[in-house]
Amino acid sequence: TLKPPGRVSTGNGADDDEEVEDLSGLPEIPIGGPGVYPIHAASGVGYGLGLAGNAHRHAPDGWLPSVKYFVEELGEDVNARDYNGYAPLHNAAARGDVELINYLVEMGADVTVLTRKGETTADMANGPVQRVTVFPAVVQLLESLGSKINHNCVSC
């Protein structure tokens, strides 16, 4: 695991009533504004949040072709951010999808982006919530590409 000694598991990292500082630098989403874009759905939105668990990680040959379609045919931005600040690369990292990570990076994805909670792409591969698999090889890949890791593994 990549959890440093003595780290206490705190679930989602904040109490429900506690305001979390937005570290992403993104503008606030207006009420009724966009939540997620199609490219987020195609890359696995929700997996790293534990909203889908392992249910949709294994879509045989479904992730890369879908994302390629949105990027190459429809011109979707590989760095598009959803309402929580997650980019498609965060979603691919949370699922341990090396093939999609490599494609997104090749197409210009920024591996250094932060979510509104300050999560990096490497953090997403490192078990950001309980019951989400840790992918050590993906963490190493993302770190080698320039992503930082906060060592906040909740699954460890």
Question: Where on the chain are the PLM-derived regions?
Answer:
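Generic long, charged, amphipathic alpha-helical segments
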Residues: 79-85
